[in-house]
C-alpha cells in the first residue's frame, strides 16, 4: 500500500489489519525460532502463535523481515503497533540509506504497544526486521498479533494533540450553566416516565438509600473522570484496546454518561445531570464514532461494524431522554444531527452490506442504539419546518418500523427451536437484552404492550436457562463459549418475561452479587415482577438441536450437575470443546469451563483451545493438535437419566480429520455419588492422547496410587484411573492481576463477573499408543 496519512503528523504504510491491503506475503518468517510457530492473516491483524519458546533466550521466538523502498523524509520515527507476550522484548531493525537503525523494547506488560524507532535523519527505509525474545520458562502456548506499521513526526504530533485537547466543562453554547435548577423529569418518557421514576426512588429509599444502590458506585466512577480530558477524534470501544491508539488507553467516554444520567434522576443530583450532558457533548464533538483511524483510513474499506456508533447512539439518546433539560436547543440539535448522520448512517450501511449480521448476534447488538435514536428523532424531527406546516406523521417513523423488522428477521434466524443459541450464554443474554429493550422502547413509543412485541422464540430459551444455570455458588451460568459474565439487564428482562423459568434463578443470583439491588433503573423496575426464586431443576434437560444437555441429581441435599457440550453444524463463537463436560457439586465447579476474558488479552484466543477444556486431545511433537472450528457436523449426546442414574454417549471424531479415526466418549453414573468417563479412541497420527480435567479448585495428585483428589468447600471428588497412564498436575498461566483493574473500568461487568485467577489448575492423564480406552472414575462425597 502507499504511505497514507492518518492525521497531520502520522501515516501508515503497512495495514496488517486489512486482509487485502496487508503486506504479509512480502514478509519472510525465519526458521529456528519457537516450536510450533505459525503466522497467519486474521480478520483484524496478523496473528502469530507458538507452543514452546526457544531454550536459548538469545534466540528470537519470532523473526520476520522484508525489503521495501519507502520515502520517510517527512517523518522522524517509525511506529510499529503489536501485541507481544508479557515479559517479551521486541527488537525493531530498519535498514536505511543512512545505515541501520535498531531498538530493543522494554519488557511488554499486559496490553499492546506502539513501539517507536527513531530514524535519525534517514530519508528512505529499505528493509525491516521484527524479532520477539521471550523467557523459555514462561512462554508456553503463546498468541500475539501485529496491527500496523507507520511513521510519525514528533513536533507536528504535539501540535495535532493540542488541537484535539481544546474542550472544557463550560460548554457555553451547548449546555445550561451550573446554576440551572432541573426538574429531574424525563424529556420523552421512553426509558421511564415520571411516575415510574417515583416508584424507583421509593424502592431505592426502601433498600437503604442511594449509597446502597450499585448505581451510586457507577455514578461515582463517572464523577471521578473528566470527560473533556478523554475527548479525542475517536471514541474507544469501552475499555477494549484492540483497535485504539496506545495514547488513548483509559479514555473511557462510553457508559459513564448513561450511568450518571440514571443516577441523576434517581437520586435528584443536579451535578450528575450536568455531568451526563457533558459526556454527551464530548461524544458529539468526537470526529468519528470509532476507536481509531482503522475504520476511516483513506483507500481502505476495513471497518468495525456499528459497535461503537450504536453504543454512542444509546448513551446520547438516553441522556437526551433523562437529562434533556440540561441542553440548549443548539446543543440538543448538534447531538440529533450526529445521531442521524454518523449513527444511523453507519447502522444502515452495515445492515445493507453485511448479510451475516442477521445470522449472529450483531443485528440485535446494534439495535438499542438504533431504535432509541430513531424514537428520539421521531419526537424532534423535523427540526425546522417554518414557514411550512409540520407533517402530521413523523418522516422518521417508517425507518423505525424497518429497524424493528430487521430485529425480528435476525431473531428468527438465530434462536433455535429447542431453546438453544450457538454463541453461548453471555452473547445470548446480551442479545436478549438488546432485543427486549428495543421492543420495550418501541412499545412505549407506540402505546403497545412490551411483552406482546417479544418474539415467542425467546420464550423457548427457558430450556437453555435450565441447561446452563449454574449450581455453583460463584457462578450464575456455566460460562461456555466466549462467555465472561452474564449481563444483569439481560437476565432481568428474561426473568421478567419468563417468571416460571430458571432465568429467575440466574437474575436473582446476579442481584445478590450487587448487594440485593439491581445496577440500572430498568432492572430495578423489572425486579418488581420477578419471583423471589426459580423453580426446581428437572433430572434431565436436553437441547438436541444445539447438542447440549444437563443432568441434575441430589447427593445429601446438594446438587450434582453434569453438563455435556455438543455442537450444531457450523456454530460460531464457539471453542474447541465438543465433547467437553462440566461437573458441579455442593456449590463448586469440580470440572469447569473457563469461558473467555477481555478480547484485548490474547488469552482470549488461548482459552478457546481444546487443551484448556475437559477434553481428550491427541499428542504430537512440535504441533498443537486441534479440531476444526467451526465443525460442520451435528454432535449430539444420546442420553437417558432420572433422579438417580445417568448415562450418555457421544460420537466425536467429526472435526478431527487427520487425527482421530475413532473417538467415542461415554458418561455412566449409577448414583449421584459416582461417575465413570470412558474414552474409546484411535488415531491416524500422533503418539497417544491426553485426558484433560480442569478446575479452579486445588488438585492433589497421588500418581503412585493413580488417584487425584479435588477439594471443594463442602465436598470433594476423588478421581482414579487404570495402569499405564501418565499423570501430572499443571498450573497453566491464566489472567494477570492487572486485568482485574481493566475490568473495573466497566462496573456493569465487574460487579457480576466471576474473576479468573492467575493460574488454571489442570490434571493431565496421558495414554500412549495409536488406540485404546481411557477410563476415569469419579467418586463424590460430602465433607
How should each PLM-predicted stretch be described?
Residues 2-4, 133-178:
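Extracellular polysaccharide-targeting segments
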Residues 77, 127-129, 676:
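Short, conserved beta-strand segments of beta-strand-rich sandwich/propeller modules, principally
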Residues 1-33, 160-169:
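Extracellular carbohydrate-recognition regions
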Residues 74-76, 88, 111-113, 124, ...:
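Residues that flank catalytic or metal-binding motifs in active/ligand-binding sites
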Residues 185, 197, 201-205, 211-213, ...:
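Aromatic-lined, polymer-binding surfaces characteristic
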Residues 422-783:
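Extended polysaccharide-engagement surfaces of secreted carbohydrate-active enzymes
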Residues 48-124, 133, 139-145:
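Extracellular ligand-binding interfaces
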Residues 164-241:
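Low-complexity, Ser/Thr/Pro/Gly-enriched N-terminal "stalk/linker" regions
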Amino acid at each position: 500500500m502507499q504511505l497514507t496519512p492518518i492525521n497531520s503528523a502520522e501515516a501508515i504504510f503497512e495495514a496488517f489489519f486489512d486482509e487485502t491491503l496487508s503486506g504479509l506475503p512480502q514478509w519472510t518468517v525465519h526458521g529456528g525460532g519457537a516450536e510450533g510457530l505459525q503466522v497467519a492473516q486474521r480478520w483484524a491483524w496478523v496473528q502469530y502463535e507458538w507452543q514452546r519458546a526457544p531454550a536459548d533466550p538469545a534466540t528470537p521466538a519470532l523473526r520476520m523481515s522484508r525489503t521495501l523502498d519507502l520515502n520517510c523524509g517527512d517523518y522522524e520515527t517509525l511506529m510499529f503497533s503489536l501485541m507481544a507476550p508479557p515479559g517479551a522484548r521486541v527488537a525493531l531493525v530498519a535498514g536505511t540509506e543512512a545505515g541501520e537503525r535498531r531498538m530493543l523494547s522494554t519488557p511488554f506488560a499486559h496490553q499492546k504497544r506502539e513501539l517507536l524507532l527513531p530514524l535519525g535523519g534517514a530519508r528512505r527505509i529499505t528493509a525491516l526486521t521484527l524479532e520477539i525474545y521471550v523467557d523459555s520458562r514462561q512462554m508456553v502456548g503463546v498468541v500475539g498479533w501485529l496491527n500496523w506499521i507507520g511513521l510519525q513526526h514528533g513536533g507536528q504530533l504535539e501540535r495535532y494533540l493540542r488541537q484535539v485537547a481544546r474542550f472544557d466543562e463550560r460548554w457555553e453554547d451547548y449546555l445550561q450553566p451550573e446554576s440551572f435548577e432541573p426538574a429531574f423529569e424525563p424529556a420523552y418518557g421512553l426509558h421511564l416516565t415520571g411516575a415510574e421514576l417515583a416508584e424507583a426512588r421509593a424502592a431505592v429509599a426502601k433498600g437503604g438509600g442511594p449509597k446502597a444502590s450499585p448505581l451510586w458506585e457507577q455514578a461515582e466512577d463517572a464523577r471521578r473522570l473528566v470527560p473533556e480530558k478523554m475527548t479525542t477524534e475517536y471514541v474507544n470501544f469501552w475499555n477494549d484496546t484492540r483497535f485504539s491508539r496506545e495514547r488513548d488507553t483509559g479514555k473511557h467516554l462510553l457508559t459513564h454518561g448513561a450511568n450518571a444520567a440514571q443516577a441523576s434522576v434517581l437520586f435528584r443530583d443536579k451535578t450528575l445531570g450536568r455531568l451526563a450532558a457533558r459526556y454527551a457533548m464530548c461524544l458529539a464533538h468526537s470526529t468519528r464514532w470509532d476507536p481509531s483511524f482503522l475504520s476511516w483510513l483513506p483507500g481502505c474499506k476495513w471497518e468495525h461494524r456499528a459497535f461503537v456508533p450504536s453504543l454512542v447512539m444509546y448513551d446520547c439518546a438516553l441522556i437526551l431522554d433523562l437529562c434533556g433539560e440540561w441542553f440548549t436547543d443548539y446543543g440538543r440539535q448538534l447531538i440529533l444531527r450526529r445521531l442521524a448522520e454518523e449513527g444511523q448512517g453507519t447502522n444502515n450501511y452495515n445492515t445493507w452490506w453485511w448479510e451475516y449480521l442477521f445470522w449472529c448476534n450483531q443485528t440485535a447488538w446494534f439495535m438499542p442504539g438504533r431504535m432509541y435514536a430513531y424514537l428520539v428523532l421521531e419526537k424532534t424531527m423535523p427540526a425546522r419546518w417554518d414557514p411550512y406546516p409540520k407533517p402530521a406523521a413523523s418522516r422518521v417513523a417508517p425507518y423505525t418500523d424497518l429497524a424493528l423488522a430487521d430485529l425480528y428477521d435476525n431473531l428468527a434466524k438465530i434462536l433455535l427451536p429447542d431453546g438453544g443459541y450457538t454463541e453461548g450464554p453471555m452473547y445470548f443474554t446480551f442479545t436478549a437484552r438488546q432485543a427486549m429493550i428495543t421492543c420495550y422502547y418501541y412499545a412505549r413509543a407506540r402505546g403497545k404492550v412490551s411483552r406482546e412485541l417479544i418474539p415467542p422464540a425467546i420464550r423457548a430459551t427457558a430450556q437453555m436457562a435450565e441447561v446452563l444455570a449454574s449450581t455453583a455458588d460463584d457462578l450464575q451460568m456455566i460460562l461456555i463459549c466466549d462467555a465472561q459474565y452474564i449481563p444483569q439487564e439481560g437476565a432481568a428482562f428474561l426473568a421478567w418475561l419468563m417468571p416460571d423459568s430458571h432465568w429467575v434463578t440466574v437474575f436473582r443470583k446476579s442481584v445478590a452479587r450487587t448487594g440485593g439491588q439491581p445496577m440500572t433503573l430498568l432492572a430495578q423496575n423489572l425486579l418488581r415482577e420477578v419471583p423471589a426464586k426459580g423453580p426446581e431443576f428437572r433430572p434431565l434437560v436436553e437441547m438436541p438441536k444445539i447438542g447440549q444437555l444437563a443432568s441434575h441429581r441430589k447427593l445429601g441435599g446438594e446438587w450434582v450437575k453434569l453438563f455435556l457440550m455438543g455442537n450444531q453444524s457450523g456454530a460460531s463463537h464457539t471453542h474447541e470443546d465438543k465433547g467437553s463436560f462440566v461437573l458441579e457439586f455442593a456449590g463448586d465447579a469440580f470440572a469447569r469451563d473457563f469461558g473467555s476474558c477481555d478480547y484485548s488479552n490474547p488469552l482470549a484466543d488461548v482459552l478457546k483451545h481444546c487443551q484448556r477444556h475437559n477434553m481428550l486431545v491427541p499428542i504430537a511433537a512440535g504441533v498443537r493438535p486441534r479440531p476444526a472450528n467451526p465443525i460442520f457436523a451435528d454432535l449430539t449426546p444420546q442420553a437417558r437419566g432420572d433422579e438417580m442414574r445417568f448415562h450418555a454417549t457421544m460420537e466425536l471424531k467429526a472435526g478431527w480429520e487427520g487425527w482421530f479415526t475413532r473417538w467415542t466418549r461415554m458418561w455412566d453414573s449409577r448414583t449421584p455419588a459416582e461417575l465413570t468417563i470412558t474414552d474409546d479412541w484411535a488415531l491416524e497420527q500422533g503418539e497417544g492422547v491426553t485426558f484433560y480435567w480442569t478446575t479452579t479448585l486445588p488438585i492433589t495428585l497421588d500418581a503412585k496410587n493413580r488417584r487425584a483428589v479435588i477439594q471443594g468447600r463442602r465436598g470433594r471428588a476423588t478421581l482414579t484411573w487404570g495402569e499405564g497412564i501418565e499423570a501430572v498436575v499443571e498450573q497453566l498461566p491464566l489472567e494477570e492481576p492487572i486485568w482485574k483493574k481493566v475490568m473495573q473500568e466497566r462496573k456493569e461487568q465487574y460487579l457480576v463477573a466471576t474473576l479468573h485467577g492467575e493460574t488454571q489448575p489442570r490434571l493431565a492423564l496421558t495414554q500412549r499408543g495409536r488406540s485404546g480406552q481411557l477410563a476415569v472414575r469419579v467418586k463424590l462425597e460430602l465433607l
